Every structure is written in structure tokens, then in C-alpha cells.
A protein has these predicted regions:
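Active-site neighborhoods of metal-dependent hydrolases
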Residues: 1-139
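Acidic, glycine-enriched loop/beta-strand segments at the rims
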Residues: 87-98, 141-147, 155-192
Length: 204
């Protein structure tokens, strides 16, 4: 689906126009995904970064192409030798990410695999990356809209009562950050760096 976000969003909008209930979808601010190591994902990726390997744990954090060269085989044989394993796949377009982020029905969020030896930076960087890079620097949307897409909109969509807003009798889930300095520091080489500009996180 690389480069096809216009078609995808048009399909969503066509279905939304014919229904009383809105359709929401989630997006995260990266051009790479992360899951188990498998051939069909390798086939469509420009780059593959190994996050963990049970059989060869010392190779976590390295590019699959480099591992294949070292093992003197193709990338599929290298993948077979690493199994079971996980990987990050660079297979998305930055233009698509920005277009989807700007859509009013897009919720911002992420899952993650924190047990990986070399995890995806989304675990540490998703929300500050949106607030700092896409909202403040690229000005894709106002700060208030960015916060709403991460909090109230998601809570409303999934029916999470008393969540997602600063309101009397609601659970006090609060992040205190500096809008001028907030930014992700985690990247694919150092994925566990704490974000900048976040002073405090309060839960319940």
C-alpha cells in the first residue's frame, strides 16, 4: 500500500458518507512497522532491522542485509537461521504518514513490544514525536487537535468512560509537557531514549 493513502482515505470517506456512525482509524508517526520476522514482510520492505533472535541473540539491532552478507547467503536464508525472531520493516511512505495524520478521523496511538532486545522507538517516541515534529514543527494541526486525537477522541471512540478529558469526576490521567521543547529522542539506533520536554506523567 506504499503511496496509496489517497485511495485508502477516499474509500473510508465513501463509506462514512453512507453511514450515520463515523469510522475512525489509528495511525502512528513512523515509516516502519515491527512484528515477527517473516518472509512476506521482508519481501515488501526496503530495509529490515532485526529486533531479537532466539537462535542468534547477538545479531539483534543489525540490518538483515548485513547479516546475510556475513553469513554468505540471501536474506531469506539468513532470516531462516535467525528464527524465531522479530524485525522492524521500513516499508511506508512519509507522505502517506503525514496525509493520514491530518485526516480528522485519525486517532494517534501505538502498540509495542517492550520485551524486544532492540525495540521499535514508537514505545518511547510516538506521542512526543507527534507533538514536537508533526504538530509544532510541520504544523500539520493545532496543538489542541493533536492532544484530542491522543486522548478524548480515542476514549470516545472505544467507549472508555471517564477517560480522555480533564473534567470533574474523571480519572486524572495527566501529562505535563513544554510545548516549545517536547520532542522524541528515541530513534531506530537508540530506541529507548526518553523524550525531551516532558516534566511529569500522572495516572489515575
Amino acid at each position: 500500500n506504499f503511496g496509496r493513502s489517497k485511495e485508502t482515505l477516499a474509500c473510508f470517506e465513501k463509506h462514512m458518507a453512507g453511514h450515520h456512525h463515523g469510522i475512525a482509524f489509528d495511525v502512528y508517526p513512523y515509516i516502519a512497522s515491527s512484528t515477527v520476522l517473516k518472509n512476506d514482510s521482508i519481501q515488501v520492505a526496503e530495509r529490515v532491522l532485526i529486533t531479537w533472535s532466539k537462535s542468534r541473540p547477538e545479531l539483534a539491532g543489525r540490518e538483515l542485509s548485513d547479516i546475510a552478507e556475513e553469513l554468505n547467503c540471501d536474506i531469506y536464508e539468513a532470516a531462516a537461521q535467525l528464527q524465531p525472531a522479530g524485525a522492524i520493516y521500513f516499508a511506508m511512505s512519509e507522505e502517506d504518514v503525514q496525509r493520514i495524520l491530518q485526516h480528522p478521523n485519525a486517532m494517534i496511538g501505538s502498540d509495542g513490544l517492550p520485551h524486544d532486545e532492540h525495540p521499535h522507538p514508537r514505545l518511547w517516541g510516538t506521542f512526543p514525536r507527534v507533538l514536537g515534529h508533526y504538530c509544532r514543527d510541520l504544523k500539520l494541526f493545532p496543538l489542541e487537535e493533536a492532544v484530542r486525537r491522543m486522548t478524548g477522541y480515542s476514549a470516545e471512540t472505544f467507549g472508555l468512560s471517564k477517560r480522555g478529558m480533564l473534567k470533574q469526576d474523571f480519572f486524572a490521567d495527566i501529562t505535563i509537557f513544554d510545548e516549545d521543547t517536547v520532542l522524541d529522542a528515541a530513534d531506530f539506533e537508540c530506541p529507548t531514549k526518553p523524550a525531551k520536554g516532558i516534566d511529569c506523567v500522572l495516572v489515575n
